[in-house]
Amino acid sequence: VAVSARTESDLQAVARDVEACGRTALVVPGDLSDRGSMVSLVASTVERFGRLDVLVNNVGGTGPAAFLDVSEQSFERSFSWNVTTAFNMTQAAVPHLLDSDAAAVVNISSAAGRHASRGFIAYGTAKAALIQLTRHLAAELAPRIRVNSIAPGAIATEALAGFLTEDLEEAMVSGTPLRRIGMVDDVAAAAVYLCSPASSYVTGQVLPVDGGTQASSLDLGLPDLGPSVR
């Protein structure tokens, strides 16, 4: 398993988990918003393991903000961070994935790309675009490479903790049929399924990992806009 991100300490923690399972981990620190880092990651992976079978695109994120507070630059940055990175990373990986007999790409999207709620216009629109990118890639790369997406709901991560209050957490739990916030392992298990032979007849799909929510359970309490807004 090859892992890459900007924070090497986090990567080393993942590597230890991988090695505890009796597998080999390759740590490649880098900024994956930079195409050169992506090419280097693919090259390092192929050099170390001799092949590339699976790509999981998990770069992304954008903080919540009211519509009138979202600048053009931040809107475009959200697309670059959530969509363009997946496009570029996949393009760098595909020449090697084509040599595999069981190649798969998994894009980590979000429930925000399927449901609308206030405060997530940049993030949600970008994640919806990532879902559509997944469908197009599935068509482009079939039959050699399967491409699917995961749409997590509320997951207990540092990003969520940054704005999660006690009241908001209670509302999110009550708005989720399974009555809990998801864990990182819930998303990881879905990724393992989509990367494995168990999903060999699945491509171009979006797998919700959201506790069964049919609408956004995240209400930031942003006020209605009125005629006094200028």
Region annotations inferred by a language model:
Residues V1-A13:
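Conserved glycine-rich Rossmann-like NAD(P)H-binding loop of the short-chain dehydrogenase/reductase
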Residues S110:
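Residue(s) in the substrate-gating loop at a strand-loop-helix junction
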Residues T90, A126, T134:
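Active-site helix of classical SDR
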Residues F67-L68, D101, H115-I121, R179, ...:
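Active-site loop immediately N-terminal to the catalytic Tyr-X3-Lys motif
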Residues S149, E170-A198, V202, V209-G211, ...:
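C-terminal helical subdomain
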Residues A66-F67, S71-F79, M172:
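Substrate-binding pocket helix/loop in short-chain dehydrogenase/reductase
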Residues P95, A138-P143, S200:
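Alpha-helical segment proximal to the catalytic Tyr-Lys
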